[in-house]
């Protein structure tokens, strides 16, 4: 045993707590921002007539708040429907999809009032006021699967703190 390891106080207790809500919101927002940039780059590369050979994706800072708040809300739905009541994925995902479309439509409508809405789906079929389109439904369903995985992971993370005996008793220097 080395002198350093002998001098290091041994932990007497470990305190563990879940990730705080603000941190999960932040992580959902950052993940959503990244997802949108990747999605727009790939979607334009594959489906737009002019293509997107450079794979340039785009988004807006407002998307951070849109995805952060929506994912945080869907996380609470996941906790209630799945963790508390065991509702199967094929029953949860249609509800998630309705929540996503409602959230995007509402955010878009509010942002449009300030000329700040960065998306316009009017050129796609099955759109509502250019704010949402069913063309994206398959992509949203994939994100519903990912949302469950991410929510489960983030809810399982714990922040642990070691409490040492000398911290509890107060360290005395003689």
Which positions does each model-derived feature cover?
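Aromatic-rich, lipid-facing transmembrane alpha helices and their immediate juxtamembrane interface loops
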Residues: 2-174
């Amino acid at each position: 045993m080395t002198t350093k390891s002998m001098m290091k106080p041994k932990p007497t207790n470990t305190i563990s707590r879940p990730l705080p809500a603000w941190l999960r919101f932040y992580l959902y927002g950052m993940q959503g921002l990244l997802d949108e940039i990747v999605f727009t780059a790939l979607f334009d590369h594959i489906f737009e007539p002019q293509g997107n050979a450079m794979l340039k994706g785009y988004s807006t800072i407002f998307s951070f708040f849109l995805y952060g708040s929506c994912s945080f809300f869907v996380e609470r739905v996941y906790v209630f429907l799945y963790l508390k009541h065991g509702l199967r994925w094929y029953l949860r995902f249609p509800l998630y999809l309705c929540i996503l479309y409602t959230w995007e439509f509402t955010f878009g409508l509010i942002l449009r009032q300030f000329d700040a809405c960065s998306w316009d789906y009017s050129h796609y079929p099955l759109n509502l006021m250019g704010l949402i389109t069913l063309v994206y439904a398959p992509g949203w369903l994939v994100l519903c699967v990912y949302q469950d995985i991410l929510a489960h992971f983030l809810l399982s993370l714990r922040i642990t703190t070691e409490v040492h005996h000398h911290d509890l008793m107060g360290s005395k220097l003689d």
